[in-house]
Amino acid sequence: MAFEFRLPDIGEGIHEGEIVKWFVKAGDTIEEDDVLAEVQNDKSVVEIPSPVSGTVEEVMVEEGTVAVVGDVIVKIDAPDAEDMQFKGHDDDSSSKEEPAKEEAPAEQAPVATQTEEVDENRTVKAMPSVRKYAREKGVNIKAVSGSGKNGRITKEDVDAYLNGGAPTASNESAASATSEEVAETPAAPAAVSLEGDFPETTEKIPAMRRAIAKAMVNSKHTAPHVTLMDEIDVQALWDHRKKFKEIAAEQGTKLTFLPYVVKALVSALKKYPALNTSFNEEAGEIVHKHYWNIGIAADTDRGLLVPVVKHADRKSIFQISDEINELAVKARDGKLTADEMKGATCTISNIGSAGGQWFTPVINHPEVAILGIGRIAQKPIVKDGEIVAAPVLALSLSFDHRQIDGATGQNAMNHIKRLLNNPELLLMEG
């Protein structure tokens, strides 16, 4: 009887995934842990390894098709895999009748402690990235009990093993549920007739676009947005960057205006901490965050990604510049990990890089504010009673009106303007 390999749970809260690429076909001989396919959900592509050795009998799900966790995606002739059979029909019936049991922590096997005897003959179900992670942490993966579906070991299980306890539930959003590399396979347009006066083609909505759409709709439906628009003379900022641009280049740093904006935003979040919170209406709680992680919205060929500069308050402008540039390269190359897109407390969206000016950026929920920066343009301003030309930066600040009042939002905007108008004040921030 063929081993029916079902789509495993590829992350917390993830119930389906799009098969973006198969690495095997019928008749191929495979070994345990060989990569079978790439499966995408939200913004992450996960490599799915084979839990058994054998010969591929039949690929059940075509590329570009969305499969639900538990669906049979490939059949493998693996005579020695009977003990590893997922008990497919039993699993299906139990999951349909009692779906809540699938994720109940009480049903999971306890995590082994480092003092317990290890069965070296035990078959381990874990992705290659998890095995590598365990090796890097000096953990014998055979000693770790898996909390994933069908006993699959996750990175959280490895961390829990190191801590000597059970895995803790993640409080991150489902959009950042895995720590695999980010990638995207563009959806191919469907072959249709282009005859007639109004030719059309259709394509399946890519998984990343679905995730972006879901996040945008959720944010707009959940948070009442208010957007303030302003502008500021940044001649001093322009001169400051010009002065230190060559010094930065000598250290291998490409200095842009964005790190200055990051530091100014962090200062505003500290002065007006309501902007650095989350508003949990269901729980009746406001979450105050005592760390300052700044998301940087990045436009890529695969869609909008938001890598995060963590602990931006502890980093210099040069360090922030280096990190932003590194994250931008990873975003363009599809190499961002989900961990690099987790944990933002406030986000910056730079429409100025596309030549834009003012706009109404959508809050990256569950954050409560987002700062939009437009282009720097030469404009006439009044200085010392005279009209002169100066570089002027457009700013747009959207905030969740449930948590932030208009005056608070404008005061935060004024603080950001003050710092960008005189960047030497950023040195006073420590």
Curated annotation (Swiss-Prot):
InterPro entries: 2-oxoA_DH_lipoyl-BS, 2-oxoacid_DH_actylTfrase, 2-oxoacid_DH_E2_comp, Biotin_lipoyl, CAT-like_dom_sf, E3-bd_dom_sf, PSBD, Single_hybrid_motif. Keywords: Acyltransferase, Lipoyl, Transferase. Pfam families: 2-oxoacid_dh (PF00198), Biotin_lipoyl (PF00364), E3_binding (PF02817). Binds 1 lipoyl cofactor covalently. SUPFAM superfamilies: CoA-dependent acyltransferases, Peripheral subunit-binding domain of 2-oxo acid dehydrogenase complex, Single hybrid motif. The active site is at H401. It is an enzyme of class 2 (transferase). Residues 80-122, 164-199 are annotated as: Disordered. GO terms for molecular function: dihydrolipoyllysine-residue acetyltransferase activity; lipoic acid binding. The modification N6-lipoyllysine is found at K43. Its cofactor is (R)-lipoate. The keyword Transferase applies. It catalyses: N(6)-[(R)-dihydrolipoyl]-L-lysyl-[protein] + acetyl-CoA = N(6)-[(R)-S(8)-acetyldihydrolipoyl]-L-lysyl-[protein] + CoA. Its EC number is 2.3.1.12. It comes from the Bacteria. Residues 2-77 form the Lipoyl-binding domain. Residues 125-162 form the Peripheral subunit-binding (PSBD) domain. Residues 166-193 have a biased composition (Low complexity). GO terms for cellular component: cytoplasm. Residues 84-104 have a biased composition (Basic and acidic residues). The keyword Acyltransferase applies. Forms a 24-polypeptide structural core with octahedral symmetry. The pyruvate dehydrogenase complex catalyzes the overall conversion of pyruvate to acetyl-CoA and CO(2). It contains multiple copies of three enzymatic components: pyruvate dehydrogenase (E1), dihydrolipoamide acetyltransferase (E2) and lipoamide dehydrogenase (E3). Belongs to the 2-oxoacid dehydrogenase family. This is Dihydrolipoyllysine-residue acetyltransferase component of pyruvate dehydrogenase complex. It comes from Staphylococcus aureus (strain Mu50 / ATCC 700699).
